Curated annotation (Swiss-Prot):
GO molecular function annotations of the record: ion channel inhibitor activity; toxin activity
Entry's Gene Ontology cellular component terms: extracellular region
Similarity section: Belongs to the conotoxin O1 superfamily.
Domain notes: The cysteine framework is XII (C-C-C-C-CC-C-C).
Pfam families in alphabetical order: Conotoxin (PF02950)
The protein, known as: Mu-conotoxin cal12b
Propeptide: 20-42
Subcellular location: Secreted
Signal peptide range in chain numbering: 1-19
Coiled coil recorded as keyword: no
Annotated S-S bridges: 45-58, 53-70, 60-75, 69-81
Record function comment: Mu-conotoxins block voltage-gated sodium channels. This toxin reversibly blocks voltage-gated sodium channel in cephalopods (tested on squid giant-fiber-lobe neurons) with an inhibitor constant (Ki) of 15 nmol/l, with no alteration in the voltage dependence of sodium conductance or on the kinetics of inactivation. Has no effect on sodium channels of the two gastropod S.luhuanus and A.californica (which are not natural prey).
UniProt-listed InterPro entries: Conotoxin
Length: 87
């Protein structure tokens, strides 16, 4: 019974993994993008802002940690664009 409850809770939280793992940008709260929007855009890097495509997301350069990602939300502390590290 306990295992079933744990599995149900995990399945309910699965779509909100981005809210749990990437909720800050360099110490400041960030605007959370909806999970379904991340599914549609996670493979796209915007070269106009200097994103580098690796696997299914973008990686941010350490020299310009704000505004050079695949989106305008900036980088996380680990230099990943929000919503792409664990996709």
């Amino acid at each position: 019974m306990k295992l079933t409850c744990v599995l149900v809770v995990l399945l309910l939280l699965l779509p909100y993994g981005d809210l749990i793992t990437n909720n800050y940008i360099r110490g400041a709260a960030r605007k959370v993008t909806p999970w379904r929007r991340n599914l549609k855009t996670r493979d796209v890097c915007d070269s106009l802002v200097g994103g580098h495509c690796i696997h299914n997301g973008c990686w941010c350069d350490q020299d310009a940690p704000h505004g050079n990602c695949c989106d305008t939300d900036g980088c996380t502390a680990a230099w990943w664009c929000p919503g792409t590290k664990w996709d």
